[in-house]
Design a protein with these regions (language model features):
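Hydrophobic ligand-binding cavity/cleft-lining segments
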Residues: 1-41
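Short beta-edge strand/loop motif at the mouth of beta-sheet-based domains
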Residues: 12-13, 31-64, 77
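A short, structured loop/turn motif at beta-sheet edges
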Residues: 21, 70-77, 100-109
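Short, solvent-exposed aromatic-acidic interface loops
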Residues: 83-87, 113-120
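Mid-chain, well-packed structural core segment of small domains
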Residues: 77-99
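Hydrophobic pocket/interface hotspot
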Residues: 24, 34, 51-53, 69, ...
């Protein structure tokens, strides 16, 4: 795992959800559910599993994110690398996404941190800030309709 240095920055999105951690964990770790709130994927909650998130390409992004599961602690913590792919792999961002689930009196505090943004990743940081805020909201909608 790459540790961010002092020159990097992190993006944090937190939201308290009125749902148990077990339910949120399902939406964070089951491929078809992940696709509903994030992107197409071949994720497996197994440390060392390499996988991709896939979306429609956009300017400055080929639509593929290369990842590896780094930490899988059921119902508590999930962490994976989040790296540029293809031609962008050499110069694009190499970050780590960590989800932390903390029980509260009324549900679960969901914390998403994407760490390791370098100064030259400012555009990616801004895009991630917008994207994660929206996607955490989408995650909550998926969780709300689970049994």
């Amino acid at each position: 795992m790459t540790k961010p240095d002092a020159a990097t920055r992190s993006l944090v999105v937190e939201r308290e959800m009125p749902h148990p951690a077990e339910k949120i964990w399902r939406a964070l770790t089951q491929g078809p559910l992940i696709e509903e709130w994030l992107m197409k994927n071949d994720f497996q909650p197994v440390v060392g599993h390499r996988f991709n998130f896939r979306a429609e390409p956009m300017p400055q992004w080929n639509g593929v994110t290369d990842c590896e599961a780094l930490v899988v602690e059921p119902h508590e913590r999930l962490s994976y690398s989040w790296n540029a792919s293809g031609e962008q792999a050499a110069t694009g961002p190499r970050t780590v996404v960590t989800w932390t689930l903390t029980p509260t009196k009324t549900g679960t505090l969901v914390r998403m941190e994407q760490s390791g943004f370098r100064p030259e990743d400012q555009g990616f940081y801004q895009g991630a800030t917008y994207g994660w805020r929206r996607m955490v909201g989408d995650l909550e909608q998926v969780v709300a309709r689970l049994d």
